[in-house]
Structures are given as structure tokens and as C-alpha cells.
């Protein structure tokens, strides 16, 4: 008998990725304070990839408490440029600042997945994509943000690659699903290995 799959996320993007792949699953958002977990990790010098893994694990373990024997998928994504770690912008002014700081530079997206069953970690994975933003004028940034509106506040980089955000980039190195925040190919491979989906 295949285990119940639970996605520990409220993200419509992550839900859509699993649905589009034909997976039968339930979704439940984790009730954790991400910033409270991130701050001590970042202060201790944890890498952005390690922070993403820790948050993915915390989300999965929080949700796993409610589903005995289910396989819970926790995920998180961090973004960094040099030593600076970015968070979702609080407002449009901060979104514009984020885009100005990314202009003409390469940043990294670290997407982590942790599978948990009965409070035990079954599997951890992190994938990284390197994203080079083309040089952006202040005028372009302002027009772009006016066009996309509050969607800019829903992602860590203030952009959605699957939409008009693609116009910000000159080069992308890495898996598309890593950029979207859920590395699907390694996840599907592991779920097949665990007998959770049809092989």
C-alpha cells in the first residue's frame, strides 16, 4: 500500500507542480515562524542551502505530527548574492531595492526538499540554480513592478520566472524546477524508490 503523500506548503506553485505531475496528495501549510528559525541559523554562519534544508525539515516535521505514517514533503527556497541572504520583499519599495541590487549580477537560488515520516527524516536534498540578471535601468524596474504589482511580494527575488520575470535575465544555470522552488526530478525519483508513486 502506497503511503499518503502530504505537501507541507501553502504555495500554489508547489501544489500545481505536484498536481501537474499527476501525484495524489494532500496539502497542509506548516505553522512555523520561518524568520525566527532563520535568524539564529544565519547568525551562526549557516550557508543559504543549509538554511533552506533546516526550514524544509521544520515544515515537514510540523505537518507530520498530524498524519501518522504519511510521507510529508517539506520544501523551502533561499536566495543569496555573495554574503547577502534575501527574503520576500515587505513592500514595493523593498522589491525595487532587491531588483536594483540584483541588476547585472549573478545570484543563487537554493531549493531544498526534506521527506519526513513519523517525525523521522527519510531524505534530504538541495539543488542550486545560478541566475544572472541583465543590467536593469531604474525606469525599467519601476515599469516592471508597476506591471506585475503585488505578485513581486510573493517570491524571494521579487520576480516570477514563469511570468514576466523572465525578462529580467540574461543567463540561467540550473534546473527549472529548482528555480520554481521544488526540484521535481530528484523528488519523483526518491518517491519511486520509496514505493510512494508508481515506478
UniProtKB/Swiss-Prot annotation:
Pfam family, one: Maf
Superkingdom: Bacteria
UniProt GO MF annotations: nucleoside triphosphate diphosphatase activity
Top EC category: hydrolase
Annotated positions for site Important for substrate specificity: 13, 77, 162
Active-site residues (renumbered): 76 (proton acceptor)
Cofactors named for this entry: a divalent metal cation
A GO biological-process term: nucleotide metabolic process
Alphabetical list of Gene3D superfamilies matching this protein: 3.90.950.10
Cellular component GO terms held in the UniProt record: cytoplasm
Main subcellular location: cytoplasm
Subcellular localization, as worded in the UniProt entry: Cytoplasm
Similarity comment: family membership: Belongs to the Maf family. YceF subfamily.
General function of this protein: Nucleoside triphosphate pyrophosphatase that hydrolyzes 7-methyl-GTP (m(7)GTP). May have a dual role in cell division arrest and in preventing the incorporation of modified nucleotides into cellular nucleic acids.
UniProt-recorded name of the protein: 7-methyl-GTP pyrophosphatase
Organism per entry: Rhizobium meliloti (strain 1021)
Amino acid at each position: 500500500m502506497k503511503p499518503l503523500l502530504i505537501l507541507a506548503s501553502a504555495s500554489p506553485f508547489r501544489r500545481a507542480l505536484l498536481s501537474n505531475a499527476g501525484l495524489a496528495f494532500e496539502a497542509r501549510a506548516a505553522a512555523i515562524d520561518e524568520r525566527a528559525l532563520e535568524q539564529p541559523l544565519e547568525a551562526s554562519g549557516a550557508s543559504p542551502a543549509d538554511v533552506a534544508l533546516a526550514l524544509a525539515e521544520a515544515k515537514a516535521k510540523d505537518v507530520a505530527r498530524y498524519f501518522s505514517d504519511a510521507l510529508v514533503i517539506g520544501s523551502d527556497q533561499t536566495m543569496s548574492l555573495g554574503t547577502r541572504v534575501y527574503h520576500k520583499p515587505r513592500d514595493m519599495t523593498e522589491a525595487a531595492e532587491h531588483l536594483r541590487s540584483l541588476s547585472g549580477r549573478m545570484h543563487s537560488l537554493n531549493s531544498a526538499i526534506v521527506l519526513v515520516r513519523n517525525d523521522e527524516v527519510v531524505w534530504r536534498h538541495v539543488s542550486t540554480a545560478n541566475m544572472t540578471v541583465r543590467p536593469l535601468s531604474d525606469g525599467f524596474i519601476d515599469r516592471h513592478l508597476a506591471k506585475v504589482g503585488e505578485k513581486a511580494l510573493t517570491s524571494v527575488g521579487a520576480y516570477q520566472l514563469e511570468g514576466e520575470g523572465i525578462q529580467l535575465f540574461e543567463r540561467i544555470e540550473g534546473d527549472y524546477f529548482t528555480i520554481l522552488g521544488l526540484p521535481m526530478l530528484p523528488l519523483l525519483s526518491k518517491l519511486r524508490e520509496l514505493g510512494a508513486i508508481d515506478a
